[in-house]
Design a protein with these regions (language model features):
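Outer-membrane beta-barrel strand-turn architecture
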Residues: 42, 88-92, 132-138, 185-189, ...
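Residues that define the transmembrane beta-barrel architecture of outer-membrane proteins
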Residues: 44, 76-80, 118-124, 140, ...
């Protein structure tokens, strides 16, 4: 009975705030992963990358100002993914990625504290990358990419018989298509490296028994500086600008409290602990946030991972 009352109040609350305070802090689908350095690999090489990410949000914003809303305490997720990249040829790479949400939850006060939780497999990402340009002097590379995200995970997840909101579903429920452009340059002294990328993603319309929804387009621009401290330790500083268009529902109606502009600073450290094995850790800190309407925004996130590049050609020839 207690759970039933809680969900009734929660459902009414969500209907009330949908046009005023829609949460985009942990929207459905996979977080952007990877170490941010999208250099291509050679033919018959295989790069495996495992990562874990934690994100926490407890700050409501109206436009670019923080405000207090007493109902939602926080939203968070814990997500792990496995990514594999294979060198099909000297210029072509193909990449796949699949992840799992161990915890995608929201804590609310209605008036007692309740935690609503989603979990499960996210979206399957498949990306092809092409090396457009490669120079020896200066040592630099330009790579283009095209990818799709397929909603293989659960999108109609409920909790004790009550359907979870779209922001807590482990999958997006929509096909997504993305393009990217990545540039890297290494200085002659091999101490400094510079990277940049442009990324854009388009989402198809969701039409299910429970949701009629379309996520807004997503755009990202990032600049990286990488410095070699020792033979095994590297530091990276990333500045990233993210743009999200407004989401839409029936009759192509835009949802006012969706869409944002956020600037992040992301320090990172990489440790080459054995041959081509690397450990990495990264924090994402919002420097500036501007949202449409009232939105629950990200306070911080951090991630860590390990990646290894294998030379399959050598192994097969032995």
């Amino acid at each position: 009975m207690k759970n039933a009352v809680a969900y009734l109040i929660f459902s009414i609350f969500f209907l009330f705030i949908e046009s005023e305070a829609y949460s985009q802090c942990c929207s459905a689908g996979n977080p952007v992963s990877g170490d941010g350095q999208q250099k291509s690999i050679n033919k018959n090489q295989l790069r495996i990358y495992w990562s874990f990410k934690h994100s926490y949000s407890d700050q409501y914003f109206f436009k670019n100002k923080k405000e207090d809303i007493p109902f939602i305490d926080n939203s968070r997720f814990n997500y792990s993914s496995l990514q594999a990249t294979y060198g099909v040829s000297k210029k072509w790479n193909i990449q796949t990625e699949l992840g799992y949400f161990f915890d995608k939850s929201q804590t609310v006060e209605i008036p007692e504290k309740y935690v609503f939780k989603g979990f499960g497999i996210g979206d399957l990402g498949i990306t092809t990358k092409y090396q457009i340009l490669s120079l020896i002097k200066p040592q630099s590379e330009l790579v283009g990419s095209f990818g799709v995200k397929i909603p293989v995970g659960k999108f109609d997840q409920d909790m004790d018989g009550a359907m979870l909101p779209i922001s807590l579903q482990p999958s997006t429920g929509a096909m997504k298509y993305n393009i990217g452009l990545y540039y890297s340059r290494v200085n002659l002294n091999n101490k400094w490296s510079f990277y940049s990328f442009l990324f854009a993603e388009y989402s198809s319309l969701i039409q299910s028994d429970f949701f009629y929804y379309k996520y807004g387009n997503y755009y990202s621009l990032a600049l990286f500086g990488k410095y070699k401290l020792t033979n095994r330790i590297y530091t990276v500083l990333q500045l990233r600008q993210e743009f999200r268009d407004k989401d839409k529902r029936e009759n192509d109606e835009k949802i006012e409290s969706t869409g944002s502009k956020v600037t992040y600073m992301a320090p990172q450290i990489l440790y080459n602990f054995y041959e081509s094995w690397y450990l990495l850790a990264q924090a994402d800190v919002p420097l500036y946030k501007y949202v449409n309407g009232h939105q629950l925004t990200n306070k911080y996130s951090f991630s860590f991972g390990v990646h290894k590049t294998l030379n399959l050609h050598k192994k097969s020839s032995e």
